[in-house]
C-alpha cells in the first residue's frame, strides 16, 4: 500500500465529506518519533516529530492530494510491544474515533515468546475492529545485521542480540506471524519489512 492507495482508502472511509480524516498510528518508539536513545528510553531519546514516518506521510499525502487534508494521531510509545496497547488502546485510540488506525509492532516483541506477540497483536486488531475502526498493518524496519565498531560500549551486547534476531530468522518469524494475523482478518498490509529485505539483499 502506497500514498495513493491510502488516499483512496480514506476517501472510502465513513467520515463526513466535509470533515478531515483522522489517522491514528499505534506503535513503538519508531512511531513515537525516537531516532536514537543514548541511555534507556524516554527523556534520554532524541525525538524528531517532523521527521517521524507518519509526519513524512502526511506531507506526501498533501502533495499528492492537497484537497484531502489528513490529521495524524501519534499513539506510539517508546519501548512498547504489542501487549502494551491492551492497557491504553481505549484511551489513546478508540476514544478519539479515528477513521483509520495503522498498527506497527514487532521490534520489541522479539524479546517475548512468539505466542505472546500473536495473541497480543490479534487482540489489538480485534478491539479496533469491534470499535468499527479500519486497520492497516505496517510491518517494521529490519534490525541491524552486525555490530558496528563505533557502537557505544553500553549497547554492544544488545546490538549483538538484535543482530542475531535478524540473521537467525527470528525477526522474519514475527513479521510472518503479523502478516498471517492480518490475512486472517482481511487487514491490508503496508509491507515495509519486505522493502527493507529487498534493499538489504541488493546491497
Feature map (PLM): residue ranges:
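Serine-esterase "nucleophile elbow" of acetyl-processing enzymes
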Residues: 2-75, 88-97
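Alpha-helical cap/lid subdomain in secreted, periplasmic
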Residues: 17, 56-71, 84-203
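Short, histidine-centered active-site or binding-site loop motifs used for metal coordination
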Residues: 27, 76, 105-109
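Short, solvent-exposed turn/loop segments enriched in Gly/Ser/Thr/Pro and often Arg
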Residues: 76-78, 141
Amino acid at each position: 500500500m502506497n500514498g495513493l492507495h491510502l488516499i483512496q482508502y480514506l476517501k472510502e472511509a465513513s467520515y463526513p465529506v466535509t470533515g478531515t480524516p483522522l489517522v491514528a498510528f499505534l506503535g513503538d518508539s519508531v512511531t513515537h518519533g525516537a531516532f536514537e536513545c543514548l541511555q534507556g528510553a524516554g527523556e534520554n531519546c532524541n525525538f524528531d516529530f517532523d521527521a517521524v514516518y507518519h509526519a513524512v506521510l502526511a506531507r506526501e499525502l498533501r502533495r499528492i492530494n492537497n484537497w484531502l487534508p489528513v490529521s495524524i494521531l501519534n499513539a506510539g510509545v517508546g519501548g512498547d510491544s504489542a501487549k502494551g496497547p491492551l492497557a491504553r488502546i481505549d484511551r489513546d485510540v478508540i476514544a478519539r474515533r479515528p477513521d483509520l488506525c495503522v498498527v506497527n509492532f514487532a521490534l520489541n516483541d522479539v524479546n517475548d515468546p512468539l505466542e505472546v506477540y500473536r495473541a497480543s497483536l490479534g487482540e489489538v486488531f480485534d478491539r479496533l475492529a469491534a470499535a468499527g475502526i479500519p486497520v492497516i498493518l505496517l510491518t517494521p524496519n529490519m534490525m541491524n545485521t552486525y555490530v558496528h565498531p563505533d557502537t557505544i560500549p553500553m549497547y554492544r551486547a544488545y546490538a549483538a542480540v538484535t543482530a542475531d534476531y535478524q540473521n537467525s530468522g527470528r525477526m522474519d518469524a514475527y513479521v510472518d506471524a503479523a502478516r498471517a494475523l492480518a490475512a486472517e482478518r482481511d487487514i491490508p498490509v503496508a509491507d515495509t519489512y519486505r522493502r527493507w529485505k529487498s534493499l538489504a539483499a541488493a546491497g
